[in-house]
């Protein structure tokens, strides 16, 4: 005969196991889970960032920064978010912010940031009321991972291969 509370613990463990199995199946069947080389396109792919290289760069031990909720909402609102993908992304992993340069509406050269990795995790954090963190690339690192687009001095990069 199980001890008091043991039956509930066993049931809870079985439920967690089933939930993890379901999430694994969701990931395996998700058309949006990355397979192979990953890039991030911004502004209809006028800018393309090498996400795999960015992940290697930020694995250097740097600390992520917590983004303000309004900034997270801006990133999510300006991304293509697939609702069926949100439930099985893990919000504990930080995203990656890169630098972005380009002409403003008045023709002046502007500088900002773009979330190149973690938009679905950011959406999940917003939905679930969790904080969202991201690693920040330097300007040099951002140009290093820029496969297509304008750099900080107006230099245009086009390092796309036929596989991108």
Residue ranges and their predicted role:
Residues 27:
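Residues immediately within or flanking Cys/His clusters that coordinate Zn2+
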Residues 30:
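Cysteine-cluster motifs in flexible loop/terminal segments that predominantly coordinate metals
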Residues 20, 33-36, 78:
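General secretory precursor processing signal
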Residues 23, 40-46, 57, 62, ...:
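Conserved catalytic or regulatory cores that recognize and/or transform ribose-phosphate-containing ligands
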Residues 2-23:
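Short Lys/Arg-rich cationic patches that frequently serve as NLS/NoLS or arginine-rich RNA/DNA-binding motifs
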Residues 55-116, 126-127, 133:
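Short alpha-helix boundary/capping and kink motifs at helix termini
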Residues 109-164:
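Basic- and aromatic-enriched surface patches that contact anionic nucleotides/nucleic acids
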């Amino acid at each position: 005969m199980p001890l008091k509370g043991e039956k509930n613990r066993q049931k809870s463990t079985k439920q967690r196991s089933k939930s993890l199995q379901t999430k694994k199946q969701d990931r395996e069947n998700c058309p949006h889970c990355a397979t192979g080389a990953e890039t991030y396109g911004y502004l209809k792919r006028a800018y393309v960032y090498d996400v795999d290289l960015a992940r290697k760069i930020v694995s250097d031990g740097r600390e992520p920064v917590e983004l303000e909720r309004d900034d997270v909402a801006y990133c999510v609102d300006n991304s293509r978010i697939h609702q069926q993908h949100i439930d099985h992304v893990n919000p504990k992993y930080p995203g990656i912010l890169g630098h972005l340069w380009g002409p403003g509406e008045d023709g002046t050269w502007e500088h900002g940031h773009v979330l190149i990795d973690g938009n679905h995790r950011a959406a999940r954090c917003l939905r679930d009321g969790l904080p969202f963190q991201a690693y920040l690339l330097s300007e040099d690192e951002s140009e290093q991972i820029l496969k297509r687009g304008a750099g900080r001095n107006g230099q245009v990069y086009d390092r796309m291969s036929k596989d991108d």
